[in-house]
Amino acid sequence: MFTGIVEELGEVTAVENLGDASRFRLRGPVVTEGAQHGDSIAVNGVCLTVVEHEGDEFTADVMAETLKRSSLGALDVGSRVNLERPTAVGSRLGGHIVQGHVDGTGQVLARTPSEHWEIVRVSLPADLARYVVEKGSITVDGISLTVVEAGPDYFTVSLIPTTLDLTTLGRKQPGDPVNLEVDVVAKYVERLLAGTQGAGR
């Protein structure tokens, strides 16, 4: 489990096509400290497994389904990525519960800067819209954010300077893809309510 609090901006140093998968080598001095084979690291919100680890770099294999459902397929050598290690039992939950299972992708639609923050509008797949509410949580490229406005096919978030400086969202431009993970609690509530309604018939 992750919290959506990005630990560092990493960098893609190599991409190898394996046919039905891709192998990424990524640099991240913070997240690789003490890393072991089989550990999980979230890369732009996607939970990946460490295959190899050497120095401040690690490699991870990404299956075709993950490449299809996320924006990882758009990464190339030199791309910056948000990195986070799983949260430890008993540690603070600084953001919200993030599984690292991307629900879909959106696109940055617009950026509106102001004196102290920036409003970013992101497109939202129709099948995810019901899980996104104003003041609720959403994960964008692995970053736990609070929804400012929820529309039928978009939402907006407000980014403070720290988020702009320390994550990829400070660099994303209109048209760039982002990974989206909706709040898992909303999905559980929907499933529970569906079961209750079915039992009452």
What kind of feature is each model-predicted range?
Residues 1-201:
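Conserved loop->alpha-helix
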